[in-house]
Amino acid sequence: VYFHQNMLIYEYQSTDWRITMKAYERLLKYVTFRTPSDENSETTPSSACQFELARFLKNEMEGLNLSDIVLDDMCYLYGKLPATTGYENIPAIGFIAHMDTVSDYCNHDITPVITENFNGVSLTLPAGITLSVHEFPHLGTLKGRTLITSDGSTILGADDKAGIAEILTMIEHLQKDNIPHGTICVAFTPDEEIGMGAEHFNIEQFGAKYAYTIDGDTEGEIQYENFNACKADFHIKGFNVHPGSAKDTMINASLVAMEINNALPAMETPRGTEDYEGFYHLVSMSGDVSEASLNYI
């Protein structure tokens, strides 16, 4: 299973009837929980709704017989699958995923759409949005696969609820197939989308020697570095007077904001950069004559 914000590509390999829930079935349940994080909040978690999913996952982890399950007051959820006999002394390995979703696109009333035997060329969603190979070349490799998307009017939330689904399905698979393993540590965190997912992460409670974050896209890919950015906010105060008598007096805050943005290198934006090249990304802007703001990462 791998995923983008609006698309989950799914191919289930196991035919073991003992597995109670497949990963995609868990994902379809998890996306019914609305969990956007809020970058303007000063609390942890930044949105109380993340606790609703956390409590649901805690109950599921109890049903999977995990031990040392802890949901702390900052919405970090931890648990362990004890080592099988003879594997108690090997290093514990951990798996991490985050519960929050982005807040800058519609994230409620999500309607998943399952498309079987994808044609490998384009996919038109019920809301009228078309995903094409021209815009997303990787789609060409998915011919014949089953895709799970939103209906195009919302996000799907596969980032990172698909990661949660994969981890708990793996836990179930290890137990029901009696696969030998060392201690498996699990953690589900809040507020990753606003850069705060690790802020209150309790490494001691987690307990892993090594760990993987299950949050990516290309199938089989392992990333050993992570995205890193800083935030820059400009707040501009203008001077507003009647435009009929404004000569040499008015300072239009919106025009000043435009000047600031135009002073930045035109090609040093996400569209014009790659790999380790830095960029200035104008996330949002607002303004009038009296006040204006620019928000960058």
Language model: regions and residue ranges:
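Short, Lys/Arg-enriched N-terminal segments with co-localized hydrophobic residues
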Residues: 1-20
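Catalytic-loop motifs flanking and including active-site residues across diverse enzymes
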Residues: 53, 159-166, 253-256
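Buried hydrophobic packing segments
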Residues: 57, 166-174, 257-261
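Active-site metal-coordination/substrate-binding segment of hydrolases
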Residues: 87-180, 188
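Midchain, well-structured core segments that form catalytic/ion-binding scaffolds
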Residues: 145-158, 191-297
